[in-house]
Amino acid sequence: MATPQSDTSLSPAASPLRTVAVVGLGTMGTGIAEVLARAGRDVIGIDVSETAAARCVAALEASTARAVERGRLTEEERARTLARVTTSTDLAAAAGADLVVEVVPESYELKQQIFRELDGIVRPETILATGTNALSVTRLAADSARPERVLGLHFFNPAPAMRLVEIASSVLTAPQAVAAVTDLVLDLGKEPVSIGDRPGFIADGLLFGYLNQAAAMYESRYASREDIDAAMRLGCGLPMGPLALLDLIGIDTARTVLEAMYAASHDRLHAPAPILKQLSEAGLTGRKAGRGFYTYEAPGSGTVVPDDLTPREDGPRTPGRPVRSVGVAGSGTMASGIAEVFAKAGYEVVLAARSEEKARAAKARIGKSLSRSVDKGRLTAEAAAQALDRITPTGTCDDFADVDLAVEAVAEDLEVKRQLFATLDKVCKPGAVLATTTSSLPVVACARATSRPRDVIGMHFFNPAPAMKLVEVVRTVLTADDVHATVREVCGKIRKHAVDCGDRAGFIVNALLFPYLNNAVKMVQEHYASLDDIDTAMKLGGGYPMGPFELLDVVGLDVSLAIEKVLHEEFRDPGLAPAPLLEHLVAAGCLGRKTGRGFREYAKR
């Protein structure tokens, strides 16, 4: 087997990588060519198709023209950028390149053929980079005559806009090659993350498991495509929902990546959901085909058009029950936030805590929150005062006797919630809707603690409730249609986006979010990547507002572990077992920001 060799010709000073050949001029190859040319590199674009080469030139002309219109390039800079790019249909055009980047379709045979041909064309010191995100860099390197000069260079789409670049080394790659390419990536204005070789690397390794679970969730008819996507956008702050993202990536591409990941991990979470195979083989591969999970205006269009699965607004509806007053049980952050939301929407609110003192303290916190909204110009002083006046604090749920909707927001403990629901059953009037805000416990267990299970439903708000737009509406097998309709109508009146889901662990958001977080912990546990690199990769490559470890420390490691245990117990999938590292940190009392230490340490206030 070949081993990495020391080669001074690979030092950054000796090899500044001024000329780069890009093999494969599809969307990604064209984007990479633009990035390189705008950074002053001479680019040789190579594709066997003259049509693809012509499309590349046209796309570069259009893209740089838009950059001029937006003030990001001058006309002179545009002309220089375009002049740096030449195209060819002959791989021999790469002979003078310092670096060759291949971004051809994900096929070992095709990539190996290109690398073998390049071995006989390029100079001995030339570095060969594969743009794969699914195939083994090591296998490609081992088949090359220069394994020490082969590495992975994974840009994200669209390459001109996305800052992250993953640089993947095999066990054969020379450190000097990695250093030279890292310097180039920095010079391009990108954020390099250096990693080892495994399918998916960091970003796609975490992202595609999540996308696969979303596809499986949709396939099981647990929730609609619109609700799954809305839940992840509004509940996690993601720029796109998972099913829309699969359509953008290409369902066939996602299937290929997942097949490679499953072959390496044998983790059921990576086994492609059957619907991905069905859609791929039917040619319904997403936006590029004009249809995937959604239907588009035309192939290549991003405009979604209605189809047979689009929810109809004009269909028959079950009328909801009238709701004028709301009881909120609890005095913590979530209960206070929910009470504020209802009061601002014009509802009379009874806020019940374990003592009247706690209830008054919760109302005082709501007053401060309303004052902050006034200071930020989001609310008038008069509206804030009126909202606060609508809240009546009390130390007993007996004062819920006349409310139309009772919302439980106490500790995430099933026995505590069941006891409270037994109390609500006794004190609330007939016909009152009883809702739990649980994020992971079975709603039906709360319902069975009452003599009126048809009146019980889940209303999972997200924290902070006044700011977060999402509410997961959770029907049990016993929930009455008019109770479901009531909660949907109430969500509209309090300006929340309601998504429907069934009563199973994690509902939509947590069932998709926490396995992703758990897999990030496993990555660190296996010493594949650092906390910082993983957080950077998911923010810059996945569009997440926070990296997984930033989020875990905010949520609380104990809370996260509890949710992951519930998911594992319900679905009994070995891949959902909580990472031992997470369990060890919780056992040590390192719970995140609230204790000053979690995955990171925080300054004490």
Enumerate the language-model features and the residues they cover.
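NAD(P)-binding Rossmann-fold cofactor-contacting core
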Residues: 41-73, 347-379
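Structural/interface elements that position substrates and couple domains in central-metabolism enzymes
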Residues: 44, 76, 122, 186-193, ...
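Rossmann-fold dinucleotide-binding core
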Residues: 127-197, 201-205, 433-502, 510
